Design a protein with these regions (language model features):
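Electrostatic, structured charged patches in enzyme active sites and in nucleic-acid/phosphate-binding
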Residues: 1-107
Length: 107
């Protein structure tokens, strides 16, 4: 299956997850609700979904004010469901971030 990516960082993330044998999905039918800075209801398509972890991953290299606002709103609405990676170094260490995140929210 061919999966289109929007950036080289997303390609790096997919390769890293594959190397770690972590199953991931990239599905445009997955839409996350948020409100933009004007209070308008919008939908956002996350970069990756990790079914095993019930976690969305957003790979963000460049931040606009609108993107910052969107991700802040998304994280407030879904506090245990998102992992945002902002550098190639964070992508390379995603296994540590996933472990820390899943341990933090285990009940």
């Amino acid at each position: 299956t061919i999966v289109e990516m929007d950036s080289t960082w997303e390609v790096a993330m997919a390769k890293r997850l594959d190397k770690l044998k972590i199953r991931w999905d990239r599905d445009e039918s997955i839409k996350i609700h948020y409100q933009n800075e004007k209070g308008k209801n919008k939908n956002y398509i996350p970069d990756f979904y990790l079914p095993e972890f019930k976690l969305f991953i957003e790979v963000k290299g460049y931040w606009t004010d609108a993107a910052r606002y969107k991700m802040k709103d998304v994280q407030e609405r879904y506090p245990n469901s998102f992992l945002i990676l902002e550098s190639l170094e964070e992508i390379s260490k995603v296994n540590r971030r996933l472990l820390a995140k899943t341990k933090k929210y285990q009940t």
